[in-house]
Curated annotation (Swiss-Prot):
Pathway: Lipid metabolism; fatty acid biosynthesis
Subunit structure: Homotetramer.
Keywords of the record: Calcium, Fatty acid biosynthesis, Fatty acid metabolism, Lipid biosynthesis, Lipid metabolism, Metal-binding, NADP, Oxidoreductase
Role: Catalyzes the NADPH-dependent reduction of beta-ketoacyl-ACP substrates to beta-hydroxyacyl-ACP products, the first reductive step in the elongation cycle of fatty acid biosynthesis.
Organism in which the protein naturally occurs: Salmonella typhimurium (strain LT2 / SGSC1412 / ATCC 700720)
Gene3D superfamilies found in the cross-reference section: NAD(P)-binding Rossmann-like Domain (3.40.50.720)
Annotated binding of substrate, by residue: S138
Superkingdom as given in the UniProt entry: Bacteria
Sites where the protein binds Ca(2+) 3: E233, T234
Chain sites annotated for binding Ca(2+) 1: G50, G53
Name under which the protein is recorded: 3-oxoacyl-[acyl-carrier-protein] reductase FabG
Top-level EC class as recorded in UniProt: oxidoreductase
GO terms, biological process: fatty acid elongation
Phylogenetic lineage: Bacteria, Pseudomonadati, Pseudomonadota, Gammaproteobacteria, Enterobacterales
Pfam families: adh_short_C2
Amino acid sequence: MSFEGKIALVTGASRGIGRAIAETLVARGAKVIGTATSENGAKNISDYLGANGKGLMLNVTDPASIESVLENIRAEFGEVDILVNNAGITRDNLLMRMKDDEWNDIIETNLSSVFRLSKAVMRAMMKKRCGRIITIGSVVGTMGNAGQANYAAAKAGLIGFSKSLAREVASRGITVNVVAPGFIETDMTRALSDDQRAGILAQVPAGRLGGAQEIASAVAFLASDEASYITGETLHVNGGMYMV
């Protein structure tokens, strides 16, 4: 599974799942451009990618910022072959208390950004008759979660968006898929109390949290030639927490 000669764009690549994805694609030969919301985050990405890529600052809710980043990538590396939409935020609240900005921020960052970025790379992929668009969803997008109506709506929306786009571009050799993680070991989960952690693990038949590398491996498979006949799918990586 080699990505030699491929250019990959991974949003939200400064840490966690995004960083694991970027490092996995680099290890398999791709040139990777990772994005962050701050200059310091972009520098950190450049530092860990080294000669194999670059970190850039990107506001995924701003069309001008997206176009600027893509122009930078074209000038230095060429057109994007693999787009990984990983950037996302949470603004949790019960619906009765949820403010409009808590709803709108999540939809703009977690859903509308995927529309903008996918559209921005589409023309070049269609010309090459090859491309991979992989979006990081969530188990919450399928099963729902109290206090996350905004987040669940955005993550569910990604699935419908990806299925529709997959139908539009399949004849051009472009695949569009979603990877939906369950509970993944992160800085946030490591800070949980023993009781909180036990409550989470009780929902997972595998009896453990997932690792960021396990999500990255799923992304790498869907980005590969081996997955060229898989499109419009959601790959659930959740230890059996939710079985579709």
